Amino acid sequence: MADALIDSQVPAKSGGAGMLKKSFPGLSFLDNLSEMTMLRQIGLLVGLAASVAIGFAVVLWSQQPDYKPLYGSLNGVDANRVVEALTAADIPYKVEPNSGALLVKADDLGRARMKVASAGVAPTDNNVGFEILDKEQALGTSQFMEATNYRRGLEGELARTVSSLNNVKAARVHLAIPKSSVFVRDDRKPSASVLVELYPGRSLEPSQVMAIVNLVATSVPELDKSQVTVVDQKGNLLSDQQELSELTMAGKQFDFTRRMEGLLTQRVHNILQPVLGNGRYKAEVSADVDFSAVESTSEMYNPDQPALRSEQRNNEERQNSSGPQGVPGALSNQPPGPASAPQQATASAPADYVAPGQPLKDANGQTIIDPKTGKPELAPYPTDKRDQTTRNYELDRSISYTKQQQGRLRRLSVAVVLDDQMKVDAKTGEVSHQPWSADELARFTRLVQDSVGYDASRGDSVSVINAPFAPAQAEEIDSIPFYSQPWFWDIVKQVLGVLFILVLVFGVLRPVLSNITGGGKGKSLAGGGGRDGDLALGESGLEGSLADDRVSIGGPSSILLPSPTEGYDAQLNAIKNLVAQDPGRVAQVVKEWINADE
């Protein structure tokens, strides 16, 4: 027995309405929509509108181009000139509201940079230089304002110069220049402070800090280097003079040592590379350099070559007389007493002895008269003589002053390792590795010693050994994965957009519309007003998304018809109950079937 969907509230003959619904399928959707409550109608319309809006947004997102920053920030950039340059070149752009970055399309990034650069737009700092002096000054400008403008201009120019150094992103310079005074007690020296903002992950070398200090100190009159302070953006003091000098000296010594080692290593390469080939040996040189400053003074004497430097002679002769002696005066100028001749000569004195100061007599006993003075000659008094000679001799002396130069090579160590020599068999062409002989290693050792200036007295060491090298493994350059390519993400966006639209259509819109239109079909098929309305269950009861649902037949006492999957017995019992409750309508349905068959 065929199954049927019957609506007991529809008149038995209503073929006109059934034909109208069949001719216009959308009327069933509107009919079912009108039978819903107002809240469900609003919810359905809002859901449909939201689905369409989301689908439209996904399509726009998939078609949206990739934007990249032209400037990470508009700080220090004339935004008006940048926008004018991009607009004139017809390059679309947008500004990121959170970071303030200026974004352009990835395809237009290179062209945008060229256009902006050709327009003369470049990032600049906010420092004001000497261009502040180009402005017209008011008639009543005071000397203080003029001095302040000059100081601001000098600070700006110094900040720009410091900012041009590597690793320095921006800089600010503050100058404290006191007013000059004619009084010495009021004289004050100027000072300066420099704040440097470094790039992330960068730092300044001690030599660069000293360069900044010297640059600022020589740009301001009477500014001493000790009065310049350099600080970074983290508050670290960079201009500690003592530490800077020590670090600078240590850095110079380290660089000098590395340069010396590099020069000696290059000499070894120049000797071994033509003989062994590239990559067949490894050489390293270690130099012990003495940077101590030594000053010495030596004085040497040669006693074999004396020289008379000075001579002093002193001859003294003294005679005893009875003349005036003592302190000059009345007491010392008294005349001498009368001379008294001895009454009897001593036995020891000779016969012709004349006492000192007595007149001399000749052999005849006559007094000898001095012809010049006409006075008698007197016997001389005793005389004391002394001769003293002082001679100073100068020895041969040599004084030498020696100052050893810093950077003296104290010791040198050279290490060379040789790979096995390669032998090619002339017959088979096979390559074999053989170690070097002792004589060949000794020959290479002598070559290396001569190339680096080997000095045994200095304690230099040169080691040349033979060891097989590990086989070199070629490093494969990893290709860029496809998922990192820009085109891949463009395709992914397109595919995701299409998938989202398909899910939205077939997963949301279609089930909703099927539920609505399916309910209308059930009611139109259950209506008894026409041939098309009274269809058998076998023709349409299994169609649509409601084929497995239980269908309600409206009437005074509603009867639920079983679904086709519940079996033939359940359907038969439901039809029997329907015939028992409303036999007239069942008879009308049978008549419609008969008329349809004829």
Curated annotation (Swiss-Prot):
Bias (Low complexity) ranges: 340-351
Keywords: Bacterial flagellum, Cell inner membrane, Cell membrane, Membrane, Transmembrane, Transmembrane helix
Biological process (GO), any one: bacterial-type flagellum-dependent cell motility
Top-level taxon of origin: Bacteria
Region (Disordered), start-end ranges: 296-392
Cytoplasm in keyword set: no
Main subcellular location of this protein, as a coarse class: membrane
Regions that span the bilayer: 42-62, 488-508
Annotated membrane topology: Multi-pass membrane protein
Bias-annotated ranges (Basic and acidic residues): 310-319, 383-392
Pfam families with a match to the protein in the record: YscJ_FliF, YscJ_FliF_C
Coiled-coil residues: none
Keyword Cell cycle appears in the UniProt entry: no
GO cellular component, one term: bacterial-type flagellum basal body, MS ring
Subcellular location: Cell inner membrane; Bacterial flagellum basal body
Molecular-function annotations in GO: cytoskeletal motor activity
Known function: The M ring may be actively involved in energy transduction.
Assembly behavior: The basal body constitutes a major portion of the flagellar organelle and consists of four rings (L,P,S, and M) mounted on a central rod. The M ring is integral to the inner membrane of the cell and may be connected to the flagellar rod via the S ring. The S (supramembrane ring) lies just distal to the M ring. The L and P rings lie in the outer membrane and the periplasmic space, respectively.
Family per record: Belongs to the FliF family.
Name the record gives this protein: Flagellar M-ring protein
Origin species: Pseudomonas aeruginosa (strain ATCC 15692 / DSM 22644 / CIP 104116 / JCM 14847 / LMG 12228 / 1C / PRS 101 / PAO1)
